[in-house]
Design a protein with these regions (language model features):
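Catalytic-site neighborhood detector that most strongly recognizes the C-terminal catalytic loop/helix
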Residues: 73-77, 110, 158-183
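Acidic, low-complexity interaction regions
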Residues: 111, 119, 124, 196-200
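C-terminal catalytic core of tyrosine-transesterase DNA break-rejoin enzymes
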Residues: 39, 43, 49-50, 119, ...
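Basic, Lys/Arg- and aromatic-enriched nucleic-acid-binding interface segment
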Residues: 1-48
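Short, charged phosphate-coordinating catalytic segments
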Residues: 16-17, 41-64, 152
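Short basic/aromatic active-site micro-motif
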Residues: 33-34, 107-111, 127-147
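C-terminal secondary-structure termini that scaffold catalytic or DNA-interacting sites
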Residues: 184-200
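C-terminal catalytic core of Y-nucleophile DNA break-rejoin enzymes
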Residues: 7, 74-93, 99-119
Length: 200
């Protein structure tokens, strides 16, 4: 039996690692840019090629008055509409006007991004092997699912053609299970008390 890419345990970064990354001084502007792009993808779920192809035209104020990315995934040509949170909005503002040809970001090559991410992980004292694609997995796991966003919404945000794909990406953390059971425990407190009393 050979592990297909679909069944491989997918890596992601944790909240703590995101904070460490943002609070670690970067050695130069390129490392800083790569870090910002990685965080941008962590908060939007966009893959490298989709961030690279992002133009000002993809940024639209939508029906709810918020800024959205309206785009199609390069890999699958599936529509992907993402309402922007504050973090990616701030990153877009930071790099505004730095590119020609209407692109949102001055994007280094994927190889450069992965090399710089390796250095950034070392600077942060993190042993995990980071590649740019880890950001997309982290969006599914750390940002969206761990904070209670329903899997159907995550699937649409990531532009998946099939919810099964989202289930592969979305490794629910033990922490999330613990939090959910804690909430459930509070909700069931009275019921459990009555049953436990009856068990004695």
């Amino acid at each position: 039996y050979i592990n297909s890419p679909e069944s491989v345990d997918r890596g992601y970064i944790t909240n703590e690692e995101i904070h460490t990354m943002m609070n670690t001084d970067m050695p130069d502007k390129t490392h800083e840019l790569v870090r910002d792009l990685f965080i941008f993808s962590t908060f939007t779920g966009l893959a490298y090629s989709d961030v690279k192809n992002l133009t000002e035209d993809n940024l639209q104020t939508f029906f709810d008055g918020n800024l959205w990315i309206i785009t199609r995934r390069k890999k699958t040509n599936t529509e992907s509409n993402i309402r922007l949170l504050d973090v990616p909005r701030k990153i877009i503002e930071k790099y505004k006007g730095m590119t020609r040809d209407n692109k949102v970001f001055p994007m280094p090559s994927n190889t450069t991004c992965n090399k710089k991410l390796k250095t950034i992980a070392e600077l942060c004292g993190i042993k995990s092997r980071w590649t740019y694609h880890v950001a997309r997995h982290s969006a599914a796991t750390t940002v969206l699912l761990s904070n209670g966003v329903p899997i159907e919404t995550v699937s649409r945000l990531l532009g998946h053609t099939n919810i099964k794909t989202t289930q592969i990406y979305a490794k629910i953390t033990a922490q999330k299970i613990s939090q959910d059971m804690e909430i459930l425990s509070h909700r069931l407190e009275d019921m459990e008390k009555n049953i436990c009393n009856a068990i004695q």
